[in-house]
Swiss-Prot record:
One of its GO terms (cellular component) is host cell cytoplasm. This is Phosphoprotein. Residues 138-172 are annotated as: DYNLL1 and DYNLL2 binding. Pfam families: PP_M1 (PF03012). A motif (Nuclear export signal) lies at residues 49-58. One of its GO terms (biological process) is symbiont-mediated suppression of host JAK-STAT cascade via inhibition of STAT2 activity. The lineage of its organism: Viruses, Riboviria, Orthornavirae, Negarnaviricota, Haploviricotina.
Length: 297
């Protein structure tokens, strides 16, 4: 019978991906809990209010009819409050964000990658804000004063098809501006290329996570350092590594990466201990030599 051998490095890389996914899910759940913190307080009971709360009512010269007015208008005030709560755009937006967070968690549990989910979510949120929170700059002071005295049905919700089309185009432009250069489009091919590059970088770093690399020290000697000593998440290390010149292209071609150069780059930017130990001038020369050697292969 033939036996199937599993590469230990593949197992370590898979465990690292699972750890990153769990940390991302925990972070999203924490953000959802923080956003819903205002819903966890104890409700205020009207029966527990002080008896002299009636003093807060405005006296319009007809104090004798205050009791009748309060009883007769009690139902109307409750109805107005319920309408305000239902029509409050900020409250509706809060519910929308809660649902978006739950949807992100469900998609990640189903196996989808976070970067793809987030790029789609950004466009949806921008479209929601553009449609439901129009720019009020065109309103005059007279319209604002009229709005405070009398309530009129909202007309912003009904828009013509041309307005909807212009709003959707604005949302797409805003999403592209927030995501990167205008020429970059969030196509499936670009996302897959970017994810494959990150996966290749993460795979090679995970394989050599505990391997010691030699660096020049300030005391004219050498010292050993590895990725474990960074005390950083693998996802954060990959993001820093993508800034090293030439690493993204090498990862796209599935070529071997200059891991000592990557480690020196990340450690020099994030580790104070490494900064105190290393000789910066010699490190720059070593990193440049490593890049030239790997790019020429």
């Amino acid at each position: 019978m033939s036996k199937i051998f599993v590469n230990p490095s593949a197992i370590r890389a898979g465990l690292a991906d699972l750890e990153m996914a769990e940390e991302t899910v925990d972070l999203i759940n924490k953000n959802i809990e923080d956003n819903q913190a205002h819903l966890q307080g104890e409700p205020i009971e009207v029966d527990n209010l002080p008896e002299d709360m009636s003093r807060l009512h405005l006296d319009d010269g007809k104090s004798s009819d205050l009791g009748k007015m309060s009883k007769a208008g009690e139902g109307k005030h409750q109805e107005d409050f319920q309408m305000d709560e239902g029509e409050d755009p900020s409250l509706l937006f809060q519910h929308y964000l809660d649902n978006v967070g739950v949807q992100i968690v469900r998609q990640m549990r189903s196996g989808e990658r976070f970067l793809k989910i987030w790029s789609q979510t950004v466009e949806e949120i921008i479209s929601y804000v553009t449609v439901n929170f129009p720019n009020p700059s065109g309103r005059s002071s007279e319209d604002k004063s009229t709005q405070t005295t009398s309530r009129e049905p909202k007309k912003e919700t009904t828009s013509t098809p041309s307005q909807r089309e212009s709003q959707s185009s604005k949302s797409r432009t805003a999403a592209q501006t927030a995501s990167g250069p205008p020429s970059f489009e969030w196509s499936a091919t670009n996302e897959e290329d970017d994810l494959s590059v990150e996966a290749e970088i993460a795979h090679q770093i995970a394989e050599s996570f505990s391997k010691k690399y030699k660096f020049p020290s300030r005391s004219s000697g050498i010292f050993s350092y590895n990725f474990e000593q960074l005390k950083m998440n693998l996802d954060d290390i990959v993001k820093e590594a993508k800034n090293v010149p030439g690493v993204t292209r090498l990862a796209h071609d599935e070529s071997k990466l200059p891991l000592r150069c990557v480690l020196g780059w990340v450690a020099l930017a994030n580790s104070k201990k490494f900064q105190l130990l290393v000789e910066a001038n010699k490190l720059n020369k070593i990193m440049q030599d490593d890049l030239n050697r790997y790019e020429s292969c």
